[in-house]
């Protein structure tokens, strides 16, 4: 009596290598259900191997620093440079050595449906997390570039009260005036797991803030557009005017402010 397809599927779930002899054994089973299960498991293993390879590549900066003796590497990234409303948010995250979190990537590449799950995984595994928030008023005062640096420095400062202190900083496309060894990495959130961890923390934190603002200031779509200049947001500006969280140094908000001051 041949093994049931259900039993074969259960056996395949335990297989983790494409070289497992079970694959060769099942290749001669002509049942369509078996062949479908076989191909499905092979595809899943290939995806798992590709993910492992991707994560390993994203640890290259960290591994090089571990070899040099650094122990607590902090990744730093920001979210919210471009929106017309809301703060710029930066995060500083120290992960355990060689830590890999499945699905962790540049937050812009992670499906929104998976943001919260990966965010929670980072929170659970991180040795330390700091968050810096610079509001729209200070952004208008100092410009968004300087505000981004201030947010990053604030995120680092938050680690002072935590057990693990960074001895090296990996920063997404930015150099900070601080007495800690550092490296600026172009597209760092896609090339360093530490920076990617900071990216998702900053992203989820800011999205939560903008969702709260959406309840306070309805009509602009902040929960969906996070303050970016979408059609709904621009229509809201025309219909209701600017809010206390809009950046007055950003167009078209800037022009609206000028128009309102002219007779």
UniProtKB/Swiss-Prot annotation:
Catalysis performed (reactions): Endonucleolytic cleavage to 5'-phosphomonoester
SUPFAM superfamilies on file? Ribonuclease H-like (SSF53098)
Keywords from the UniProt entry: Cytoplasm, Endonuclease, Hydrolase, Manganese, Metal-binding, Nuclease
What does this protein's record comment on cofactor binding?
Manganese or magnesium. Binds 1 divalent metal ion per monomer in the absence of substrate. May bind a second metal ion after substrate binding.
**Cofactor(s) annotated in UniProt:** Mn(2+); Mg(2+)
Record-annotated residues binding a divalent metal cation?
77-78, 172
Entry keyword Calcium? no
Residues covered by the RNase H type-2 domain: 71-262
Query: GO cellular component terms?
Result: cytoplasm; ribonuclease H2 complex
As for subcellular location, the record says:
Cytoplasm
List the GO molecular function terms: manganese ion binding; RNA binding; RNA-DNA hybrid ribonuclease activity
Q: Identify the EC number(s).
A: 3.1.26.4
Has keyword Transferase?
Answer: no
Q: Per its UniProt entry, which superkingdom is the organism in?
A: Bacteria
- Any GO BP: DNA replication, removal of RNA primer
Family listed: Belongs to the RNase HII family.
Write out the function statement from the record: Endonuclease that specifically degrades the RNA of RNA-DNA hybrids.
Q: What is this protein called?
A: Ribonuclease HII
Q: Which organism is it from?
A: Streptococcus pyogenes serotype M12 (strain MGAS2096)
What's the gene?
rnhB
């Amino acid at each position: 009596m041949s093994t049931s397809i259900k039993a074969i599927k259960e056996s395949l779930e335990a297989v983790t290598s494409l070289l497992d002899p079970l694959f060769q054994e099942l290749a001669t089973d002509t049942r369509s259900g078996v062949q479908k299960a076989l191909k499905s498991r092979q595809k899943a293993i290939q995806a798992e191997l590709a993910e492992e390879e991707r994560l390993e590549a994203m640890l290259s900066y960290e591994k090089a620093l571990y070899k040099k003796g650094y122990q607590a590497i902090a990744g730093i990234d920001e979210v919210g440079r471009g929106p017309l409303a809301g703060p710029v948010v930066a995060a500083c995250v120290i992960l355990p050595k060689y830590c890999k979190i499945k699905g962790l990537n540049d937050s812009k590449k992670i499906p929104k449906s998976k943001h919260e799950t990966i965010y929670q995984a980072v929170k659970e595994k991180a040795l330390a997390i700091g968050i810096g928030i610079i509001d729209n008023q200070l952004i208008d005062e100092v410009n968004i570039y300087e505000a981004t640096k201030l947010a990053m420095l604030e995120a680092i400062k938050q680690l002072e009260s935590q057990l693990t202190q960074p001895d090296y900083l990996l920063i997404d496309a930015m150099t900070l005036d601080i007495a800690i060894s550092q490296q600026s990495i172009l597209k760092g959130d896609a090339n360093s797991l530490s920076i990617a961890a900071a990216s998702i923390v900053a992203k989820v934190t800011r999205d939560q803030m903008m969702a709260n603002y959406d309840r306070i200031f309805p009509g602009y779509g902040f929960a969906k557009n996070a303050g970016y200049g979408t059609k709904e947001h621009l229509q809201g500006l025309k219909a209701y005017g600017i809010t206390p969280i809009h950046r007055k140094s950003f167009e078209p908000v800037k022009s609206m402010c000028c128009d309102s001051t002219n007779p």
